[in-house]
A protein has these predicted regions:
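Active-site metal-binding loops of divalent metal-dependent hydrolases
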Residues: 10, 160, 206-207
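Generic beta-sheet signal
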Residues: 4, 152-158
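Short glycine/proline- and acidic residue-enriched helix-loop micro-motifs
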Residues: 98-132
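Conserved beta-strand termini and adjacent loop/short-helix elements that scaffold enzyme active sites
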Residues: 7, 77-79, 205
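Acidic, low-complexity terminal tails and accessory targeting/binding regions
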Residues: 83-105, 146, 150-153, 168-219
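Phosphate-coordination/substrate-recognition cap region in phosphate-metabolizing enzymes
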Residues: 34-112
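Loop-to-helix element that buttresses phosphate recognition and phosphoryl-transfer chemistry
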Residues: 3, 10-62, 129-136
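A mid-sequence, solvent-exposed acidic-amphipathic segment
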Residues: 126-153
């Protein structure tokens, strides 16, 4: 049986000019996760990450924490990229004019409303439709599971959205459950997928025992 570990990137720079940069906490989360996995004897046969900086740097931090650096060169698969959440919110037709993007709670409320609008296929000037997003993530998940042969461990560093879509697809391919998963995925958490003769199955979701106190973040 093979295993795919879906890892959400560490904390990025919410409210900054460039969100796609790990915070100091984000770097620490990646190193803590790598050390935690290494302590449990996890040695990846392949490491995959999306094309985003926060995903790449989380994979780097994990390798540093685990001592994997240089052992398994990472492979870039843009299918694991996050959707343009900033552009999606900006294109939401009911966006409040006075929304403070640095206010976590206010942003989260509007983000969930905009995401529901986008997922339902409602009109908007979006850079990517939800259906296109779901299709590319499912294709990336297929590539990862196919590469996880008997005894293999494939580590995939991605983002909350793609991991949520993958979980929804594994539980019920006909249901758009991803929004419920997406709102609770912790930075640097691990979601385990096992791959056997009957295909891929979701084993665990959102593991984060390596995090305590201020290292436990959602955004």
């Amino acid at each position: 049986m093979g295993v795919v570990l879906l890892v959400r990137h560490g904390q990025a720079s919410f409210g900054a000019d460039d969100y796609d940069v790990l915070s100091e906490t984000g770097w620490a989360q990646g190193r803590l996760l790598g050390a935690w996995l290494a302590e449990r004897g996890v040695t990846p046969t392949a490491v995959v990450h999306g094309a985003m900086r926060r995903q790449r740097d989380t994979a780097l931090a994990m390798a540093e924490g685990a001592g994997w650096a240089g052992d398994v060169p990472p492979v870039v698969d843009p299918g694991w990229d996050e959707f343009d959440h900033v552009g999606m919110v900006a294109a939401y037709p009911h966006l409040p004019a006075d929304l403070d993007l640095t206010d976590h709670r206010a942003f989260q409320r509007v983000f969930e409303q905009a995401t529901a609008h986008w997922t339902a296929g409602e009109p908007g000037d979006f850079t990517e439709t939800y259906d296109d997003f779901e299709t590319r993530v499912r294709a990336a998940l297929d590539r990862a599971t196919v590469s996880a042969g008997q005894g293999d461990t494939v580590v995939v560093v991605s983002s909350g959205g793609p991991i949520a879509v993958a979980c929804g697809a594994l539980i019920d391919p006909d249901a758009r459950l991803w929004q419920r998963f997406n709102t609770v995925i912790v930075n640097s958490s691990v979601t385990r997928v096992v791959v056997g003769s009957t295909g891929a199955r979701l084993l665990t979701f959102n593991e984060h025992p390596h995090l305590e106190g201020d290292h436990l973040t959602y955004r």
